[in-house]
């Protein structure tokens, strides 16, 4: 009987404490949310600040510019040539970590950033110049991704936080191209006579006239890349772009301003590569295309063992080998310094990264 009374007393005591705590908890909680907020952190980041970061993410760092832009694409299209075996673009080798570098870097940074910017502009009711500029940059980001990989996440990409889409679908490249053209047309129309981006815009400094020319020129570029797939649509969009007004001088050149430090994307990604990898040389194919062109001596300088600009044949190796096609012995390159290099003025880490001319 005493045990039962003791248990009953425990229950009453616990109930009393719970009731007392409930009465006082409101007083204890008052202002708790304010105490748990970092007074030095911003509640909302301005679109201009996000845009500055996204532009630098799009320009990219050493990682993706070395692997995607140079090791693969530059020798694949035969602007550069090298005897280095890991420069796989013109040697039919495959390195997945190199081939996917643009994807690996852009989706978590540039794609996520630009989708967040557009979402914030929508929430703020901004349908003017800032939205038009953001949409043009968005097209440029996806333009490079689909040209590199074909079908890619597009319509649902970068919306993991915004819409909870954790597994975005892959869109067909044809659908992506048609939507990008539509986006450019609408984006240019949204841009007015001024923008609040200002110095946060490391491409044009908020100059809306130049952004319009960039948007129309990118429309023309996309149209030209469609000629083998859909000639009629390509012609229609090309005419539309030219009529709207494309780039007409070097003053319209779309390029990102970089600095020689601190580390990371503040530096030109290509410049960082040139600082540590001296393997690449002018391609003989590109040299032939620029024969008699004054731009050749602006882009390249003679190799240290030569006084004239000479290009290296693509597919060259440092050792001789027998061609499986002709049965002839192909001599190896014994002195790569005979061949031209990128002009020193273009190799710095503070050189602008050109998006389009």
Model-based region annotation:
Residues 9, 33-42, 297, 354:
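A generic signature of intrinsically disordered, low-complexity regions enriched in glycine/proline
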Residues 20-21, 63, 231, 303:
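Alpha-helical transmembrane segments and their juxtamembrane interfaces
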Residues 26-81, 85, 94, 105-108, ...:
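Membrane-proximal, proline-rich intrinsically disordered regions
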Residues 44-45, 80-137, 141-357:
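Structured, solvent-exposed acidic/aromatic patches
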Residues 1-36:
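Bacterial Sec-dependent N-terminal signal peptides
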Residues 14-15, 71, 142, 225:
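General helical structural elements
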Residues 11, 25, 76-77, 256:
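Intrinsically disordered, low-complexity regions enriched for glutamine and histidine
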């Amino acid at each position: 009987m005493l045990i039962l009374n003791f248990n009953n007393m425990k229950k009453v005591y616990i109930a009393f404490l719970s009731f007392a705590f409930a009465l006082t908890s409101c007083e204890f909680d008052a202002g708790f949310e304010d105490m748990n907020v970092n007074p030095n952190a911003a509640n909302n980041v301005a679109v201009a600040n996000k845009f500055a970061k996204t532009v630098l993410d799009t320009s990219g760092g050493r990682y993706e510019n070395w692997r995607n832009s140079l090791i693969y694409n530059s020798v694949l299209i035969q602007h550069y040539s090298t005897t280095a075996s890991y420069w796989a673009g013109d040697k039919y080798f495959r390195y997945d970590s190199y081939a996917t570098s643009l994807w690996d870097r852009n989706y978590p940074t540039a794609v996520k950033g630009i989708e967040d910017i557009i979402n914030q502009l929508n929430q703020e009711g901004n349908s003017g110049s800032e939205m038009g500029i953001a949409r043009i940059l968005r097209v440029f980001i996806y333009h490079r991704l689909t040209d590199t990989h074909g079908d890619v996440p597009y319509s649902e990409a970068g919306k993991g936080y915004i819409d909870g889409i954790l597994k975005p679908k892959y869109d067909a490249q044809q659908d992506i191209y048609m939507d990008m053209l539509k986006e450019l047309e609408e984006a240019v129309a949204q841009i007015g006579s001024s923008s609040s981006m200002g110095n946060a815009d490391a491409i044009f400094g908020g100059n809306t006239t130049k952004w319009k020319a960039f948007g129309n020129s990118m429309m023309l570029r996309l149209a030209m890349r469609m000629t083998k797939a859909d000639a009629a649509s390509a012609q229609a969009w090309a005419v539309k772009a030219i009529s709207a007004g494309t780039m007409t001088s070097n003053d319209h050149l779309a390029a990102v301003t970089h600095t020689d430090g601190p580390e990371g994307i503040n530096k030109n990604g290509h410049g960082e590569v040139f600082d540590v990898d001296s393997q690449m040389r002018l391609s003989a194919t590109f040299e032939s295309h620029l024969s008699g062109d004054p731009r050749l001596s602006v882009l390249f300088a003679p190799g240290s063992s030569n006084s004239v600009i000479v290009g290296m044949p693509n597919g060259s190796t440092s050792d001789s080998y027998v061609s499986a096609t002709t049965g002839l012995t192909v001599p190896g390159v014994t002195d790569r310094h005979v061949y031209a290099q990128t002009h020193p003025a273009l190799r710095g880490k503070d050189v602008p990264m050109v998006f389009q001319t």
